[in-house]
Every structure is written in C-alpha cells, then in structure tokens.
Amino acid sequence: MKKLMALALAFLMLGTLLVGSVYAAGSKSSEPYKEEFYMEVFLSDNGDAKIIMKNSLLGPQSRIDEFVSRILNQTNMTNEQAIKKYEAQLLGNYIAQLKNSGLETTNQTLHLLGVYNGTHNVTLVFTAYAKSFAKYYSYSKYWEMILDPTRGLATSPVPDSGLPYGSEIRNIFVIHLPQDAKLLEYPKPYTMEFNHSKFYVRSEVKGNTVIVSSDIILEAYLGPEGYKALFSKYDTFYVRYTTPKPGKEQYKTSVVMQEIIAKVLDSTDTELTTRQIFVKPEQDVDYFKAYIKMLGVKNATNMILQNNVKYLSSQGVVIKNASAQIYGLNDKGPLILETRYLVQNFTKVVNGTYEYSFDPTLGALNGISYRAKEETNQTLKIQFLLPKGAKIVKLPEEINRDVNGNRFTLKTTVKDNNITVISNVYIRYGALLDDVQKLLGNVSKVQIEYTLPEGKGSALGTKEIAGIAGAIVLIGATLLILKRR
C-alpha cells in the first residue's frame, strides 16, 4: 500500500510544504489548519495529462501572516524578488517529489498568489504536463489512474500523541477522460467518523468528467488509532476506463537466476556454492557492473563476503573457509556473483534427520503492493549432493500452477544421491496482488530431509537456516541495490 500511495503522497506534498511553513515543529494552535485543494486533470488518449493543482491556505490567519512575513523578509530583495525566489525553491522541491514517486513531468510552473495583495489567504498554483499519468494494463484491459481522496493521509506516519493542531481540509478532483472513453470505476461515496474527526467522500459523473470531493476534519492530538478508524476501510483509489484502442505499455523485465549447491562431505562438513545471475533489466545490470568497477573488484568481493559471513554466523553456521568471484564484468550479458564456503551447522538436525527449509517463491509476493510494477522471471536451483549411505526422507512436492498467465513451477529430481530442486516464478506486468496470492500465497516454505550413515552425523547442526535460498544469495545483490539508492 505504501508503494501504491507514493504518488498520492507526492500530491500531498503541495499542502505539506505549506503546513510545515505555517506550523513550525512543536508549535501549538487553538485554531485548526484550514486548506482547500483543487486538482484538475485533462487526460490524453495516450495516458499523458495536463494537470492543474491549486492549494489555498485559509487559516489560521495569524499563522498565514507569519508565513507571508517570512517569505518577504529577505535582505536586499523586493517583495516580488522574494516571492520569485520562494516559488523557484518550492517548484524544485515539488518536481523532485513527483519524480521520486515515478511521475515524469514537463512544462512545470508554480505561482504563489495572495501574498501582498490584501487577500486573507495564500494560494499555490502548480501546472505541468505529466507523462503516463494514466497507465494502460493489458493484464486488466483498461486504463487506470490514481485518485486518492485521503491525500495520502491513509498511509502517512502519525506520532503516537498525534499532531498538536486540528485540520480542516477540503479536496476537489476533476478528471476529464479522453474522448470516447468508457468509465468503469471511480471513487464512491464514503462516510466515516471517529470522535470529532470526520472523513467524507462524494462523487458524481457529468458526461466524460468525473468529479470527486472529500472533506477531512481532524481533531488536535488525533493518534494512529483515529487515523486507522477514519481511513483504513477506504479502498477505492482509482479511476478506471477503457478506450476503443488499447494503450501501449512501458515496463521493465527482471530476470534473475539463483543457484545453491550444497555438497555434504563424509566428514559432515558442507561445501556450499552460491550463484546469483543477473540477466535483466540490462540497464540495471550495466549499472551494477559499473559500480563494481568503481568500487574495485577486490573491495566488492570483500564486502559481499563480509555481509554473507556475518549473516551465516548469526544463524549458527560455522564457517571454515570463504571466497567470492564476480564474472561478466567486461562482457555483454549477465553479471554473476559467486561465493564458496566450507561450513558446519548448515542444516537443522531433528532426531537424527537433517532438515533444510527454503522459500521456493524467492519472496516474490513481498515485492507486490497492489499490482506488479514490472515483469518478473525468477529461477531458483538448489542441489544437495549427499555422501554414500545417505537416505532421502522427504522432498518438495511438484508444483505446476497458472493464474491468468502468471506461472509457478517446482520440480524435484533425484539421481543417485544427488537432489536437484528447480523452481520458477513468472509474474506478468500489471498482475493484481490477489492473483499473485492465489499463485503463491500458501507456499512459503518447503523442505529437503535426509539422514546420514551412522557415525557420519554431527551434533553441531542444531540451527535451522530458514529460507537460506532467499537470504544468503540475495545479500550481495542487496548490497549493490542499497548503494544505488
């Protein structure tokens, strides 16, 4: 939900920037913060849109006067120069917020009205041309744009003690659909109250125009419980429509392969090899390669090992030896991170049976908040090479599922005492969370179990490395991703 609301939170910023200016941190007021927000969207056939947003501060007047005074109180500047300076700073901040939310804009303007013309309110007017404001999903065969009557308050963090001032916020959204569009869904009327706080939504359709309004009244010191009561059950955040011609989709395709090879030695030590193979998106793969070169291969491998060894040690694994290699840095194609270890305590031992648990879905469900924002193809290959005399007790059952083109397969093969488990998860771009849950929801852990010949076992293995396939191999990649962020 937080990812889903990134754009809504960006729209909230136009008001938030003003709230922060009107109410300094820790300030209190007996008068509520009053605001009116107006947003008008003119959608084109390709999903691009002209957007107009107006945000008016209506009170308290004393705070507005202080806010205006701070803007105009600039050394060696006329009032006009001071306003232009503030507008430029605010415009830069707002463009950055929209970009971070995933919305690309051009031809942006921002004007601050009512500062010194004798009016009793201040209004910000922001205009821009937004690319792909509405997105087409072939998965659902309709266009979709976010419209959040809560203005992001449904997911914004709130102090346990609440805010030291009340708020009265009026929101109006006017959405002009493309010509020949057929409206499918839009925010419906809603009413919720909690003590003296209220949240109302009203909506209507006039021709090809959708009009949604909301009123939000928040009492001072309203805590998280109150916000939850007001907003948690509201779930219609979209305008959806079809057009005679389907739209074009633009999205990334992620292809990652992960391998774990565990060779159980006669001494009950385990030779562990892990590989993570990045195939797509090619732009990200190239970035990873460039980052490693900048960091230095030796430094990069050391950092990967340090993180992996730290994780394994925290799980009770005894590491006797460790090394890392990086392949594909100077070639077109995949980037491969490989680590090798000699370890003890790799599996959990229960009544003489060795158990290895892992998540065959690679946590694919965790990366989806509402819709899949990219096409994903993940493959996991696990091999257990058991010594002579070992007996296989339990293996993962075969899985072959298809939900609306999303696929999840798991296959186990045994040759001599070598176990190979291969799982694959393919998620379509735009796949709905409900469908992915149907595909993966009841599979989060499977097990390989085996016994070793008498005298070959170890009393050391008492810790379970739960889901190591989704943890140890990912650490090296996570390191790079975090650095990028």
Ranges and model annotations:
Residues M1-A8:
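Bacterial N-terminal signal peptides that target proteins for export
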Residues I475-R485:
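C-terminal membrane-anchoring or membrane-association module
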Residues L9-L17:
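Hydrophobic core
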Residues Y23-G470, L482:
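Lumenal/extracellular ectodomains and adaptor appendage modules
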Residues T16-S21, L480-I481:
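Hydrophobic membrane-targeting alpha-helices
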